[in-house]
């Protein structure tokens, strides 16, 4: 991205490569050798892309979040990344991650008809390891919670059980109910008028059943969203790949991710 004199952001280029870092860490506590090799290859491709813009690894900031934070061998991997690619990786802690997400959301909606100052709002971000919840009471932060409820964690806990739609839905609901008391002590959930969901999976859902408000902001009717989630639970991973043009690793957690948002 580049920024003009007024501080306005202009996206120049964008790249994304799926990698099962989270699945490694949440199952074994480490990033295994095969995934490390894949990570190095991805970063080398990014390095080549950046070189096309005249940007060196020394001028580039690399950030890692929950999967790296939890990996027992993170220091060794960071050293390997630096030696083989030139990128220096910075690990973002949970508090900073929430702050950056809040800033990103407020920047996205600043010129849109969303009333932060007079309405109660919940911002939800579903990841592989955790689900981050930010609660806003009339423009002020009322509470921040990190639930141990992520797509990869759920997949691992239910993979040896029957994984029907109702089973997964029940598991997610029970996990959320365990923390509902602490959430209610900070903000009356019944009074929340605005629900802002952030993430690739919910963005895809918005393209299918939502309506655009701006370039990066979409609105989804709650019932349409629930109906869509129920429909896709019948799809296999291969069907999700074919229907939604996503990678296999993305398709593996797509259905569970949307269940958490719902």
List PLM regions with ranges.
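Helical "lid/coupling" subdomains associated with nucleotide-phosphate turnover
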Residues: 3-5, 20, 24-57, 67-120, ...
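N-terminal glycine-rich anion-binding loops that anchor highly charged ligand groups
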Residues: 9-19
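Active-site-adjacent helix-turn-beta-strand microarchitecture at beta-sheet edges
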Residues: 127-130
């Amino acid at each position: 991205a580049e920024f003009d004199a007024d501080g306005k952001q202009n996206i120049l280029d964008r790249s994304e490569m799926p990698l099962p870092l989270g699945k490694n860490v949440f199952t074994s506590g480490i990033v295994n050798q095969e995934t490390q090799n894949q990570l190095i290859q991805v970063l080398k491709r990014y390095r080549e892309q950046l070189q096309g813009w005249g940007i060196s690894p020394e001028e580039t900031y690399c950030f890692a979040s929950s999967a790296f934070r939890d990996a027992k061998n993170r220091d060794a991997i960071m050293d390997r990344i630096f030696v083989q690619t030139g990128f220096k990786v910075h690990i973002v802690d949970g508090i900073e991650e929430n702050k950056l997400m809040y800033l990103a959301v407020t920047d996205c909606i600043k010129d849109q008809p969303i009333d932060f100052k007079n309405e109660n709002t919940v911002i939800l971000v579903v990841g592989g390891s955790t689900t981050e919840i930010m609660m806003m009471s009339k423009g002020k932060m009322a509470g921040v919670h990190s639930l141990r409820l992520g797509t990869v964690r759920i997949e691992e806990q239910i993979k040896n059980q029957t994984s029907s739609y109702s089973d997964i839905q029940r598991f997610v609901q029970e996990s959320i109910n365990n923390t509902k008391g602490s959430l209610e002590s900070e903000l009356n959930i019944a009074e929340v008028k605005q629900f802002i969901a952030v993430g690739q999976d919910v963005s895809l859902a918005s393209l299918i059943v939502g309506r655009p408000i701006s370039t990066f902001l979409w609105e989804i009717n709650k019932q349409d969203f629930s109906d869509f989630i129920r429909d896709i639970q019948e799809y296999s991973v291969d069907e999700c790949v074919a229907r939604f043009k996503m990678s296999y690793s993305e398709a593996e957690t797509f259905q569970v991710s949307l269940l958490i948002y719902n």
